[in-house]
Curated annotation (Swiss-Prot):
It comes from Rhodobacter capsulatus. This is Hydrogenase expression/formation protein HupH. Pfam families: HupH_C. Belongs to the HupH/HyaF family. It comes from the Bacteria. Residues 1-24 are annotated as: Disordered. Coiled coil: none annotated.
Length: 275
């Protein structure tokens, strides 16, 4: 005889849930995301900062033009201390920072206006406007640590790295622009020895990028042309996505056309408020 009685589902009923002061161990989720809020520099006498205001107007026009493609550069060396300070205060610090090795070594900080970059180094003090600073493209794959072309003797823990390396070398040699080829290491079975071998074979390039926001993204150029390591971390610094991209520049580092158009408008709003 078939019984009409059914057991309750697992996880329901007395004793299935924590009681009293027992705590639940929830994973911590991202708690916030940066958003733009206008900062208006305090200027007592706008006539004393005419060069800075003129430059900001030119930067806004440059952002508008670069939204259609290309880059623009504005040298800050000719500004006196007061005008230079106004530029620095207006630019602020955005979510993307870059370290570019080479001569001269460069530190890049995106401003609060997306696509407007402060570039500093020995003898270098300028603002660049565009999807990404020029040196981040031209120097990216200059070897800080050379990659290798021949596999070394393989350790016991190596499983999938040789096949991935062969695929990446082929994609690197064939890449002529366009859409990125992405290998998602998070979804592929691999060992620590695989990662060590990949790092050894690909080498390390000249550009490291950190994008902060809803978690962090670390982008590292390898010494293999067009090959980037792109790693996403949550707000607790746990690695949640690990990829290798074959592309000119990973999209996550680029300011979009809409970003540049928006930046042009916001810089002009600041100018109007100061004047």
């Amino acid at each position: 005889m078939v019984s009409n009685f059914h057991l309750p589902p697992v996880g329901f009923g007395p004793g299935s849930q924590p009681e009293g002061d027992e705590e639940l161990g929830y994973m911590q989720l991202p708690s916030g995301m940066r958003t733009y809020s206008a900062h208006l520099p305090e200027v007592e006498d706008s006539s004393a900062v005419t060069p800075a205001l003129k430059l900001l107007d030119e930067i806004a026009a440059g952002a508008e033009a670069c939204a259609r493609g290309g880059m623009a550069s504005f040298d800050l060396a000719g500004l006196d201390a007061q005008n230079r300070a106004l530029i620095a205060e207006t630019m602020g610090q955005g979510e993307v920072a870059m370290k570019i090795r080479g001569i001269p070594a460069l530190m890049v900080q995106e401003s609060v206006f997306a696509g407007v970059w402060s570039v500093a180094g020995a003898g270098v003090d300028r603002i660049e406007v565009g999807a990404v600073p020029a040196a981040a493209l031209s120097r990216a794959f200059e070897p800080f640590r050379k990659g290798q072309t021949a596999l070394p003797p393989l350790s016991d823990g190596v499983v999938n790295a040789p096949a991935l390396i062969a695929e990446l070398f082929d994609k690197s040699a064939a890449y002529v622009g366009g859409a990125a080829d992405v290998i998602n290491l998070t979804l592929l079975p691999h060992t620590e020895e695989d990662l060590t071998l990949l790092d050894y074979m690909l080498g390390e390039g000249a550009v490291t990028i950190l994008s902060r926001g809803y978690g962090n993204c670390r982008i590292t150029a390898t010494a293999t042309p067009h090959v980037w390591r792109v790693q996403f971390y949550n707000s607790t610094d746990a690695l949640i996505l690990d990829t290798i991209e074959v592309t000119t520049m990973p999209e996550v580092a680029l300011a979009a056309r809409e970003d540049l158009e928006d930046s042009a408008g916001r810089i002009r709003e600041v100018l109007e408020a100061i004047r």
